[in-house]
Amino acid sequence: MVKLDDKNKKFKGKKKVKNVLEKKAKGLKLNKVDRKRIVKIEEKAALKSKVDKAVKDELERLKKSSSTSVFDNDGTRDSLCSESSFGSQPAPKKKSKKVLFSGELEHVKVFDKRVQDLQIKPSEASPGRGILRSPLDKKVKKLAKVKTVKVAQEEEEEHSAPPKKKVKVNAEKAVASEPADDENLESVDEQAGGDESHIDIPTLKRKRVAIQVTKSVKEQLLNMPRKERKAFLKELKLKRKPEGARAQKCKELWEKIRMGKTPKAEKDTAVHELYGLVKGHAAKLIYAHDTSRVIECLVATEREGIINNLFNELTPEIVRMSKNVYSKFFVKKMLKNGTKEQRDIIINAFRGHAPTLLRIKHAAEVLEYAYNDFANAHQRYNIITEFYGKEFILFREDNIRSLTEILAEKPEKKVVILKHLDEVIGAVNEKETLRLSILHKLMLDFFDNCDEEKKINLLDSLKDKIPEFIHTPDGAKLAIKLIWFAPVKERKLIVKNFKDLSVKAAMEHYGHRVLLALFDTVDDTVLLNKVIVSELANEMKKLIEDDWGEKVIHYLVHPRDGRGIDKREITFLAEGDSNPHSKKTQKDRYGQLYAGITENLYPYLAANFEELVFEANKSKFVAACLETTSSFDLFDRQVPAEARKSCNQAIVELAKKDFVPMDQEGFHIIEHQSGNFILMAVMRCDAALQEDERLSVALAEGLTSKQLGSWVTCNRGCHVLLKMLQVGGPKVIEKLKASISRKHLDGYNSKGANLLKAQLDGNVKK
């Protein structure tokens, strides 16, 4: 029996080793990967030993040469040269793996025996920019000591000869970029073999080269003449960018084509020449920031043959182009301007790649553009179902179904499908792709079919981002369902996130529905009035002039009113009435929200009544704002008395204008369709109001008998007078009887005139 505390006993089980070398030493079985690793490790060890040996030999040679160079010809040691080449400065610290010259200038000094008073000061040279970059992997880089050539200017006295370029040999640590560095060591040895301390080299002008090279290449370049070095760099650049010359020529032609002053004949020639350069090389040119615009220029020429040939050449690159920041514009341009067949080719090319494309910012834009603007219903269904799993990629269906219907038919697939959706949503809802309608559709499907725990997780990840995705139908629907599902604390956070965004949301086609859902469900009306309603009230003109903004104001005045919003929206909003987190009654909630809007609403109506009353699509809104409470209203709405009086006075000012039947310059409010509708709707409520708040009384007191009597000449005017007789008090009836000429009225046989005659006769009899 093995005791637990017995450390000498070996554990009988799977043997653990630290690396493959230990595995080989223990005689364990090696697989193919292990054998390859052992070969690489042995090669690296051999290279390291080879480099270490070369460095060691070189250091010994330098040590011998330095021991002999510090003596004069007579064998005595020179006091000035008794110090090392680094002077009294401390040894340089280990540098990074870039080779720079500025750091070494702080320590490398060239001394001359004739200088008696030697002062060592730190160099003020600005740091240089190294062109050396090691392309090898960090694991392959080895540190080696090699010789570097340093150039310094020798200080001469007044009567000395002209200065000479001298080189000081210094050993330091640098990067061994490749095994061939042994050759570089030998070449440096040969250079240092003549004079141990000084080497004459040709003067070279420093010129920044916009290309990166390895250390070995750099050492070769420093020993080349200027012309040879320039030619070598040009050749090296061409090897790295083989399409460079072609791209430059393409850009020159592109500039000629896009200039407005270029004659048409030259443009045509340049277009054909440019296409000749691009043809066969488009797949390489399309990904660069400059040449991609050249190809887009060819597409913009609207030459069908060129466009078709370019599209056919780039068809295999569609998915890759969609992922690139520059080439994606070619794909979008072909979606917009291409033929139906070309659009189908692009959309079909995305088959099997939709989940990957959605995770990439630029590719997601192209996928959204194709899905939202050009794909038909079946293509959209195929794109969406790719996110349900690989089975839906391989086996496509002709029958379009929702996820709920798919899960009802195949309940065993529910776990797998929801897992795929959860992974996609978790990967992209933190990025800019949150605004894409494809993701909104996926999140809505996921929310409708997942369990309670998943809904809570989705709410936690989206509760502070709801204003970002309410601009699409699926996004707005998801936001509304999240509001219904959210507890009180989360609802307050959602409301606060609409700060400074309420007006923008209210003016959106789908975003305004989310505000209506907040008005229906949030019990904290103080917070709603402070954050949302107050912002809406301050932008009353902008909202009322906007079709969607007017619906939001109408909803605050008349909630669930079929005259303001579609009945299907009312039915959908009613589904949230049964949520478990709303406790306040509708009467109290709507009444408190209405109180927050009245202070700005009615002064605006009174000040802009003439503009509103003659707009056909605003008449229902104005009438609804001035109506009294009916049995269909969800709360007791009371228009402030002063606000109603100011609106009545605005109507009276419009009615005072001279009435000219069928006026070509503009109908009178009595004859205008919208104006007459508002008058009749407001006076219909006079019976329930105090006498001083009635519109009929205001008209009777504000207009002269001549003005009132002139209204009998049109049918609509007779109807207005008839309504005033029916709802007005004794003063109104008396004023109208004195104003209407019965002889004049008998000359008209319109329906309104006949009804007015009957009403007057009835009143006379009474």
From Swiss-Prot:
Q: Name one GO cellular component term.
A: nucleolus
Q: Keywords, A to Z?
A: Repeat, RNA-binding
Biased composition annotated in UniProt, kind: Polar residues: 79-88
Checking InterPro entries in the record gives: ARM-like, ARM-type_fold, CPL_dom, PUM-HD, PUM3, Pumilio_RNA-bd_rpt
- Bias (Acidic residues): 179-193
Q: Which Pfam families match?
A: CPL
Q: Which Gene3D superfamilies match?
A: Leucine-rich Repeat Variant
Q: Which portions of the sequence form the region Disordered?
A: 63-98, 152-197
Which GO terms of the molecular function aspect are on file? Answer: mRNA binding
Please state every residue range assigned to the domain named PUM-HD: 245-602
The residue intervals holding the Pumilio repeats read: 313-348, 461-496, 497-534, 535-571
Q: Which domain of life is it from?
A: Eukaryota
Any Gene Ontology biological process: regulation of translation
Q: Which PANTHER family match?
A: PUMILIO HOMOLOG 3
The protein, known as: Pumilio domain-containing protein 12
